[in-house]
């Protein structure tokens, strides 16, 4: 069986082609990039997706799919609708079933596929999501998460204020290599974190301190918080595998800090490769393969859910 996956939750329109053995046959994407100092405009991101969708889909269709999966949420509603509509259009064209998948779960499952881990804790870090997750009682349970904004949104918000191009993460990581530490608010509550205090503090410091110092301090403080709550979750769940996934998983410093923590615990660690860490269609396709029993040709029932949480999904498969 071959599944075409369509990702369109935020700035990226991506398509992937994956078979039932987990072989990734194609993975193509194009990203909407707002001007420096600006965030994602949902209407402009939607138009970007409409403009590139057929080209990106055609590049991935090196073989005829047996089914189509699309990211139904969480995400920006205008962007989600583009992916859903294209999934329905191509499913009708090929007369094949369609299945909605949860964007967050797709990040987790592509991580498990690549890591070949059986029962990991997962640190999922992206623009809108920052969660510490493990599988318990037929669902992925969120043991810790941000109480305000995602770590990726924090990086991009700071980047906008500092006039750093979107997405800001890679340039912040590079600037941080030359920085020195400045104390910032450190907010951990059990296994939850908050980033809004750090954001406010950093924005007030722009222009008063070297940008390299601000980038370094942002990373060191926020990543230490994430590693602390992740280690706490691993101890609580008594698990000895950790997967770092999501767009921010591409950050080498965060991966290094996670690896050090795992080594000290005698645990295994896997950083999802950069081409699969961020938003892309291959993860949607693989999640479609896993949830193939839910696929249907009732195209008019295809829905989106912009607030669809990780822990609301019943896991009907064994990955």
Describe these PLM feature segments:
Residues 1, 100-121, 287-288:
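Conserved phosphate-binding catalytic cores of ATP/NTP-utilizing and phosphoryl-transfer enzymes
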Residues 2-64, 70-74, 103:
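N-terminal beta-alpha supersecondary unit
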Residues 13-19, 122, 130-134:
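Short beta-strand scaffold segments in enzyme catalytic cores
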Residues 27, 173-242, 251-265, 270, ...:
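A contiguous, well-structured pocket-lining segment that forms one wall/lid of small-molecule binding clefts
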Residues 64-73, 238-249, 270-273:
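Short glycine-rich phosphate-binding loop at a beta-alpha junction
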Residues 70-96, 252-260:
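Short Gly/Thr/Asp-enriched flexible loops that form oxyanion-binding sites at enzyme active sites
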Residues 105, 137-178, 200-208:
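Glycine-rich phosphate-binding loop plus the immediately following alpha-helix
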Residues 109, 272-315:
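Glycine-rich phosphate-binding/hydrolytic loop that grips phosphoryl groups
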């Amino acid at each position: 069986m071959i599944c075409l996956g369509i990702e369109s939750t935020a700035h990226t329109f991506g398509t992937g082609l994956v078979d039932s053995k987990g072989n990734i046959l194609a993975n193509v994407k194009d990203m909407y990039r707002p001007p420096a100092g600006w965030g994602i405009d949902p209407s402009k991101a939607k138009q970007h997706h409409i403009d590139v969708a057929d080209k990106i889909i055609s590049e991935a269709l090196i073989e005829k799919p047996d089914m189509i999966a699309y990211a139904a949420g969480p995400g920006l509603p205008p962007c989600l609708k583009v992916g859903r509509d294209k999934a329905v259009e191509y499913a009708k064209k090929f007369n094949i079933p369609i299945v909605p998948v949860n964007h967050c779960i797709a990040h987790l499952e592509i991580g498990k596929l690549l890591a070949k881990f059986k029962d990991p804790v997962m640190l999922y870090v992206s623009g809108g999501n920052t969660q510490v997750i493990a599988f318990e009682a037929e669902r992925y349970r969120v043991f810790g998460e941000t109480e305000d904004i995602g770590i990726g949104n924090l990086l991009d918000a700071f980047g906008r204020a500092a006039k750093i191009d979107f997405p800001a993460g890679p340039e912040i990581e590079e600037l941080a290599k030359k920085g020195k530490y400045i104390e910032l608010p450190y907010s951990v509550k059990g296994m939850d974190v908050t980033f809004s205090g750090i954001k406010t503090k950093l924005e007030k410091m722009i222009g008063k301190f070297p940008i390299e110092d601000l980038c370094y301090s942002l990373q060191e403080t926020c990543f230490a918080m994430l590693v602390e709550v992740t280690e706490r979750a691993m101890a609580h769940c008594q698990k000895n595998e950790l997967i770092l996934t999501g767009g921010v998983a591409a950050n080498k410093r965060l991966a290094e800090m996670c690896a050090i923590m795992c080594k000290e615990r005698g645990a295994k660690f896997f950083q999802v490769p950069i081409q699969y860490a961020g938003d892309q269609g291959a993860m949607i396709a693989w999640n479609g393969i896993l949830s193939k029993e839910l696929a249907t040709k009732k195209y008019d029932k295809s829905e989106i859910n912009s607030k669809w949480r990780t822990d609301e999904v019943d896991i009907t498969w064994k990955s």
